[in-house]
C-alpha cells in the first residue's frame, strides 16, 4: 500500500489538551483548609425513615405526661370547675388520644397518597375526618 501525505487541517474548535502537570502544581501550592472535616450529613429522607421505623416499633407514649395533664385540666374547666382526676384516668385518656391521632394520621397519609402527594396537608385531615363521619 502506498503511503499518502498528511496535510494540515484547520482546527474546528475542539478541546485543547489539558496541562495536568500545571494543575497538580497549583493544587499543591494552594493553602489547605487546615484539615477541617465537614460534618457528616445523611441524604434527605434517610433520618425521617429511620424515625418512622423507630416510632412504629415503640409502644411508649409520645406526648409528655405533664403538658397533656395540664391540657386535660384546662379543657375540663370549661365544663365544671374543681374537677379532680385520678392519675390512671389521665393515663387512659392519653392512651386513647394517642391511638386516635395515630389512626387519623394513617388515614391522612392515605388521602395524601391518593392525591399523588407525599406531604400531608390540612385538607387531607379534613377529608379523612369527613370519610370517618366525624365531621359533616
UniProtKB/Swiss-Prot annotation:
UniProt xrefs under SUPFAM superfamilies: Histone-fold
Keywords: Acetylation, Chromosome, DNA-binding, Methylation, Nucleosome core, Nucleus, Phosphoprotein
Gene Ontology MF annotations: DNA binding; protein heterodimerization activity; structural constituent of chromatin
PTM annotation: Phosphorylated to form H3S10ph. H3S10ph promotes subsequent H3K14ac formation and is required for transcriptional activation through TBP recruitment to the promoters.
Post-translational modification N6,N6,N6-trimethyllysine, affected residues: 5, 28, 37, 80
Gene3D superfamilies, A to Z: Histone, subunit A
Ranges annotated as biased composition (Low complexity): 19-31
Keyword Oxidoreductase tagged: no
Sites of Phosphoserine modification: 11
N6,N6-dimethyllysine PTM positions: 5, 15, 28, 37, 80
Cellular component GO terms, alphabetical: nucleosome; nucleus
Domain of life according to the entry: Eukaryota
Post-translational modification N6-methyllysine, affected residues: 5, 10, 19, 24, 28, 37, 80
Disulfide links within the chain: none
Family label: Belongs to the histone H3 family.
Subunit organization: The nucleosome is a histone octamer containing two molecules each of H2A, H2B, H3 and H4 assembled in one H3-H4 heterotetramer and two H2A-H2B heterodimers. The octamer wraps approximately 147 bp of DNA.
Protein name in the entry: Histone H3
Upper lineage: Eukaryota, Fungi, Dikarya, Ascomycota, Pezizomycotina
Amino acid at each position: 500500500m502506498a503511503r499518502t501525505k498528511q496535510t494540515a487541517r484547520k482546527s474546528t474548535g475542539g478541546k485543547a489538551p489539558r496541562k495536568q502537570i500545571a494543575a497538580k502544581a497549583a493544587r499543591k501550592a494552594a493553602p489547605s483548609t487546615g484539615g477541617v472535616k465537614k460534618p457528616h450529613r445523611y441524604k434527605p429522607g434517610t433520618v425521617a425513615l429511620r424515625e418512622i421505623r423507630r416510632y412504629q416499633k415503640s409502644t411508649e407514649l409520645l406526648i409528655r405526661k405533664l403538658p397533656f395533664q395540664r391540657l386535660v385540666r384546662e379543657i375540663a374547666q370549661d365544663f365544671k370547675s374543681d374537677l379532680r382526676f385520678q392519675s390512671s384516668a389521665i393515663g387512659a385518656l392519653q392512651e386513647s388520644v394517642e391511638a386516635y391521632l395515630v389512626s387519623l394520621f394513617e388515614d391522612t397519609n392515605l388521602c395524601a397518597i391518593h392525591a399523588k402527594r407525599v406531604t400531608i396537608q390540612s385538607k387531607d385531615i379534613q377529608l379523612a375526618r369527613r370519610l370517618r363521619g366525624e365531621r359533616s
